[in-house]
Every structure is written in structure tokens, then in C-alpha cells.
Regions:
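A short, sequence-level motif marking secondary-structure junctions
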Residues: 24-26, 69
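Short aromatic-glycine-(Arg/Gly/Cys) micro-motifs in beta-strand/loop hairpins
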Residues: 1-21
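A short, charged, amphipathic alpha-helix used as a generic interaction element across diverse proteins
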Residues: 16-17, 26-49
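Short, mixed-charge low-complexity intrinsically disordered segments
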Residues: 41-69
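Hydrophobic beta-strand residues in large extracellular and virion-surface proteins
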Residues: 4, 24, 32, 36, ...
């Protein structure tokens, strides 16, 4: 299972704020990243006032990957 976070800031590694988050119940990092990218684009399109700039996918052990760069 992974946690997907939508963040605001200059980079996904050091977000200024976590805007929203949700759990992604999959064992596939590729599936979690695909869901995160889709959620990011949809949020930017449908709720631009939220100021979302990046996504992060965090594993149960705390390892994070994200984007866009």
C-alpha cells in the first residue's frame, strides 16, 4: 500500500504544504504513480485555486518518489 500526497511548493522533495492525501491500496509502484499523476492533473484542472504543484507517492517504509521534477 502507498500514500499519495498532492503538494504545493517549488519541488516534490521539499513541499511547502501537503494539500491533500489518500491511500492507494496496491502493491504496484507503477499503478500508484499513474494514479498520482492522474489525480494531480485532474486537481490542477478542476480546482486550480488549491495551488497543487506536485505529487508524492510514499511507501509504508517512508520511501518517497514524486514529480513532476
Amino acid at each position: 500500500m502507498f500514500r499519495i500526497e498532492l503538494t504545493r511548493g517549488s519541488s516534490w522533495q521539499e513541499p511547502v504544504e501537503t494539500i491533500d492525501h489518500r491511500d492507494c491500496e496496491t502493491n504496484s509502484i507503477d499503478a500508484a504513480v499513474a494514479e498520482a499523476k492522474y489525480w494531480l492533473v485532474q486537481t490542477q484542472k478542476n480546482a486550480p485555486a488549491r495551488g497543487v504543484t506536485h505529487y508524492r507517492v510514499v511507501s509504508e517504509n517512508g520511501t518517497a518518489i514524486g514529480g513532476p521534477p
